[in-house]
Structures are given as C-alpha cells and as structure tokens.
C-alpha cells in the first residue's frame, strides 16, 4: 500500500490531500482496500455511486454498448440519444436537455445559457448580465463555477474571474432581495448545500426565491449535481420545497458510478438561446455515456432507490439523533444525505470511523458528511450507527 501511495504522490499534482487508504475493489455499498479490509462506503464518490458500486445492470449496459459503438460526433445522430433525452426530459418535466460530461462543465453551460438569455430575452446589455449565487456553495472549480464561490482560498491565484457575479447568505431572503438589480439574469443555488456541510434551507426560503425570480424576470437555476437523483429521498431535492426551477443541472449519479455524465435541462423559452455553434462538447451525449446513463436511471426507478433513500435515510437520521456527546453541535439531513456537525475538528472522529470500517470524510473541518449508496440495507445502517456510538462513547 505504501509503495502505491508513494508512487501516486510522486507523479500526481498536489491538488488533493487524500486519506492514506488505497481502495482496489467495490461492490454495492462496500469497498475493499489493497489489504483486503472491507468498508461501508459513506462517501460514494460524493454521491456518484447512488446505484452502488459496479451495479450489474449498468455494467452490462456499458460492456454491451462498448463492444458495439462508443463514440461519434454530435454532428451525427446516434441511435440511443433521443430515447435517453425523452426519458430524462420527462423525469425533470423539461422540454430540452443539453448532455455533457462533468458537473462543473454543466454549471459552465448553465452560466452561458443564463447570460445569453439575460441579454437576448430580458434585454440586459451584453457584458452587464449579473448572476447571484449563495455563500458556502460549491458549483465546481473551473473558472466560471469558481467565480460563483465566496471561498477566497479556492479562488486565490486564479483572478481575474468572471465579472457580474455576487453571493449572498444561503437562507437570507432579505439579503437576496437587496442584491437583485435590473441586470440580474439568474439566481443559482443548491437546494441543499453539499460540500458546504449538508445545509438545509429555512422553511419557505426556496419558495420565496422562486417568487422573487417570477417578480423580477430572473431564471432560477437548481444545481442538483450532488443532491439530485434520489440522494435526498426525492428525484430532485427541489421537490422538498415544491418549487420548479427554470434550469436543472445534473451530474454525478447520472453516470451510474461508471462514467462522467452531466446535463442541463430547461424549457424551450430558455434553451432556445443555444443555436448551432454557441456550445458544444466532444464527448457529451456519446453512445457509451448514454447507454450507461439510461441504465443508471432505470436502476433508480426499477429498484425504487429514491423511495428507499427517503425511508432508510429517515431511519439512519433518527438513530444518529440519539447520539449524545458534548462535541456534537447538530445532526441534520434528508434521505441518505446527512451531516454531523461538531464543535471541534472532525478529522480525528473520521479517522476512528474509518478504523471501524466506515468510510467517510469531513468537510469544512467540523462536519462529517454521510452519503452511502442508495442500495444500502438496514443491517449496514445498524453497522454505521454502532460505529458512531462506539467512537463517541470512547
């Protein structure tokens, strides 16, 4: 294991500080390290493996398509893209979809759409379009996505970033109201902030944001890359708020844990600003990606993993709420997306949980984030709870 870590560290760029653990196999909820030790994976690649690791249905779809046709350019039609587009548009109740690869790439595309819509439809002078984002967000690390962040540490050394972006506190409707100007084209938010610490908005906040958008002719963009596709116990986390955004951004679990697939979805009145040449993607919507994503969506539906997430997530949250320890500040979550916020450094607790076979990670230093595959069962949840009880007792 040490030689693998040393080799990787020697050749890798230094933009990650990984746990000193080498994973070599995954199946369902579990992963194994190179020493053969088994873990319950409560990271899931940060909600990539919602369907579980190496789901046989998705693997089968991947291998069958890979042996037939993997890539063609979007200057041609493929035989499976249209059916996938119909499936995902019906799921999101949107007219159009733009298939892409990574989550941050989809955010970049949504920014472009919002800007073009702002100038062409709302009539904002080109170059003066503004987008409002939320403090403590995470939309990605490419320049456009990074421009939406308020984390100076993430942005240091990468200026100048996009102009016309501003951030306000997540959950503060008065601050958001004050930030809106005639040049505001879009408000982008995560319905539940993920990397920010599983932050759930105050009751009625998202509905109030929707009302502001309607009043001021502003697009509401929901970044559901991490929280969508069953993670919170709904197909889309916006469903918890009974709010329909103008634009959905999806990713992560859209590729079933096997392939990078992302998408931007909107209705005709928004998506029509994209015309030939205004956007493109070499790999977006390729036949292999589409075969995998189709199977990934089918597994979520056929195995009722969205409903399972709500049911078992509620069970897990209720059990964790019984934990008593002076270090625990708050435990919160929806579905199988749970944050345990401490009033101290979470890293030692994470280390102890990993030693007990629970693979997890801290975020923002004090929060333990749990997002196991949605195929988890009650016995595995009991093991997670037992590990937490043991760690906090000792």
Swiss-Prot record:
CC annotations in GO: cytoplasm
**MF (Gene Ontology):** identical protein binding; ornithine aminotransferase activity; pyridoxal phosphate binding
This protein's pathway reads: Amino-acid biosynthesis; L-proline biosynthesis; L-glutamate 5-semialdehyde from L-ornithine: step 1/1
Q: What is its EC number?
A: 2.6.1.13
What Pfam families does the database record attribute to this sequence?
A: Aminotran_3
Q: Which reaction does it catalyse?
A: a 2-oxocarboxylate + L-ornithine = L-glutamate 5-semialdehyde + an L-alpha-amino acid
CDD domains recorded for this chain?
A: OAT_like
* Subcellular location, record wording: Cytoplasm
Please name the GO terms of the biological process aspect recorded for this protein, alphabetically: arginine metabolic process; L-proline biosynthetic process
Which keywords does the record carry? Amino-acid biosynthesis, Aminotransferase, Cytoplasm, Proline biosynthesis, Pyridoxal phosphate, Transferase
Superkingdom assignment? Bacteria
Q: Which residues carry this modification: N6-(pyridoxal phosphate)lysine?
A: 252
Q: Which HAMAP family match?
A: Ornith_aminotrans_3
Question: What the protein does?
Answer: Catalyzes the interconversion of ornithine to glutamate semialdehyde.
What family does the Swiss-Prot or TrEMBL record give for this protein? Belongs to the class-III pyridoxal-phosphate-dependent aminotransferase family. OAT subfamily.
Please state what the protein is called.
Ornithine aminotransferase 1
Q: Which organism is it from?
A: Staphylococcus aureus (strain COL)
């Amino acid at each position: 294991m040490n030689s693998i870590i040393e080799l990787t560290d020697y050749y890798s760029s230094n933009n990650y500080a990984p746990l000193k653990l080498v994973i070599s196999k995954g199946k369902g909820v579990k992963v194994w390290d190179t020493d053969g030790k088994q873990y319950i994976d409560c990271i899931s690649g940060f909600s990539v493996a919602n369907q579980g690791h190496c789901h046989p249905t998705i693997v089968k779809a991947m291998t069958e398509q890979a042996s037939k046709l993997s890539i063609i350019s979007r200057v041609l039609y493929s035989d499976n893209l249209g059916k996938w587009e119909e499936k995902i548009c019906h799921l999101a109740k949107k007219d159009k979809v733009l298939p892409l690869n990574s989550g941050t790439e989809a955010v970049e595309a949504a920014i472009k759409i919002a800007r073009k819509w702002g100038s062409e439809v709302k009539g904002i002078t080109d170059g003066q379009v503004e987008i409002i984002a939320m403090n403590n967000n995470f939309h990605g690390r490419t320049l456009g996505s990074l421009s939406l962040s308020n984390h100076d540490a993430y942005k240091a050394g990468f200026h100048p970033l996009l102009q016309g972006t501003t951030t306000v506190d997540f959950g503060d409707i008065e601050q958001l109201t004050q930030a809106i100007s005639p040049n505001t084209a879009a408000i982008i938010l995560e319905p539940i902030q993920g990397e920010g610490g599983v932050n759930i908005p105050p009751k009625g906040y998202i509905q109030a944001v929707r009302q502001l958008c309607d009043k001021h002719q502003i697009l509401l963009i929901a970044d559901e890359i991490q929280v969508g596709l069953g993670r919170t116990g709904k197909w889309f986390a916006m469903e918890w708020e009974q709010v329909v955004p103008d634009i959905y951004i999806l990713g992560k679990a859209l590729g079933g844990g096997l392939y990078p697939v992302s998408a931007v979805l909107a209705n005709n009145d928004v998506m029509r600003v994209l015309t030939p040449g205004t956007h493109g993607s070499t790999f977006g919507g390729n036949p292999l990606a589409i075969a995998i994503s189709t199977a990934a969506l089918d597994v979520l539906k056929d195995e009722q993993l969205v409903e399972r997430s709500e049911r078992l997530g509620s069970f897990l949250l209720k059990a964790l709420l019984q934990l008593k320890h002076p270090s625990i500040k708050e435990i919160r979550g929806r579905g199988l997306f749970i944050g345990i916020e401490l009033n101290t450094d979470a890293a030692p607790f994470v280390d102890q949980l990993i030693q007990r076979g629970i693979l997890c990670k801290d975020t923002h230093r004090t929060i333990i984030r749990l997002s196991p595959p949605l195929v988890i069962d009650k016995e595995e949840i009991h093991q997670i709870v037992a590990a937490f009880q043991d760690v906090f007792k000792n």
